[in-house]
Amino acid sequence: MGHNWECANFMTLTSEVDGSSRDFVIVGAEGADRSHPNSIFTEYPQPVTKFPREERSLQWMCGRLRADHGMARPAPAMDYVCGSKFDHALMYGVNSFHDPQSGKQIAYGWITEEDLPQPLIDRQNWSGLISIPRDLSLVVVKNVVGALNSKLEDITSLELELESGGTYKARTLGISPSHKLEALRGGARHVKVSKPHALSLASRIGLDVQTCRFELFAAFQVSDHCRRIGFSIYHTQDLNPEFATSIYLETESETLMIDRPDSSHVDPDILTFSERAPFTLLNIMQPDGSIQREQLQVRAFFDESVLEVFANDRCTFATRIYPATKRVWGIRFWADDDSGHSELLGSKAWDGLRADIRVQ
């Protein structure tokens, strides 16, 4: 959890599913103990680079606030229940506030420019930017019986409550794009895939997205035989995968990945290693007693060199990519699944988002 905390946020969130409430703290954690077995820098080590990223991260913790009477005067204390990273890439310094109009807790953060060498930062005369607003919530999933591979009790981002039928109620922090961002869609070109399609590595199912300013939503059904599933954003006309951005789930390792395009043509010192985060899909018991895996739902916002990704409203990335061109040559959906049972259930995109309007 780092050697120093800064930009701390405290909040109480209430679920719309069952009315339960939990206390949360979001902190910027500076420094890291690389020798600790649970260090994020040990589990997901960075490649050797000329200028590695700062050893800092955004963390959230869920617990129960109480009064500690073990001191001369009662002091507030929190019993830790669960936690994870608030963002798994470059976001830092988050602050949040309660929006009286929507009743939601809204968070903003700083997306840094650590992956650019200093000469390029100096040339552009600015560094970093503010993220899109994120709605925070207490997510509650009922009737959970398992995950892709991990035991439920080993998933440290979940609070588990045993239900009467032997299933579990799982709670975690929900992080989703603010609904107010829908105002940016005005005037954008709407493209979609309406029907389910079986996916393979050779699939040609895609969306005709052309600009570097778009919002994307995609829903997938992931089979037991699937090894990887996701989509690729092409930045060159020849659809060269080396210069594409690929966002996908590795099911065996339960890891969500973002492979960023090669930017050595711009500057060999730009960092383009893959972003990764622990992520799994939950298995849920249905009223008829059958077990159904939840969908993989991905939302992505791309704006020139900024990519923000949200998976199932509980795993997020805010990263930077520096593509070869200032446009996109489409998005293709695919799966590494020989059975043909993994599907794209549907997708839609708003291409050419406007940035010159005021979001109310």
Labelled PLM ranges:
Residues M1-Q101:
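Gly/Pro-rich turn-and-neighbor structural signature
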Residues G31, Q59-Q360:
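Beta-rich accessory regions
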